[in-house]
Amino acid sequence: MKRKIVEHLGQVDYSGMVVPMAVIYKDPNGVNEEYVVRLWEGSTGKPTDIEVRTKTLCEARKAISRSGRMDCGIPRAECDDPAIVETWI
């Protein structure tokens, strides 16, 4: 899937989304030394094509907070992909 990279999640059109979620990853495959925030549609359990790339975890969290929608961060569960840091709902 070709990704659309935005500066923050406040730039996203959420119309048509039922349960937007953001997942923060640390150094996922192909993106070294970065945090990547991927926007997911929680109602389908599938990622969208939207992502934000930042240098720090703090910047990743700020990019999510600018959405004005997701304000609850949940730490990675033991069964999650090791690259996942947090999920925001």
Task: Go through each PLM region and give its residues.
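Glycine-rich loops and low-complexity Gly/Arg-rich segments
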Residues: 47-49, 61-64, 76-78
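Low-complexity, compositionally biased segments
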Residues: 16, 30, 52, 83-84
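Short, mixed-charge low-complexity intrinsically disordered segments
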Residues: 71-89
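Short N-terminal "domain-start" leader segments
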Residues: 1-36, 43, 65-69, 75
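Secondary-structure transition/turn motif
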Residues: 38-42, 88-89
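Short C-terminal domain-edge/linker segments immediately following a structured domain
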Residues: 55-58, 66-70
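A short, exposed loop/beta-hairpin motif centered on an aromatic-Gly-Thr core
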Residues: 45-57
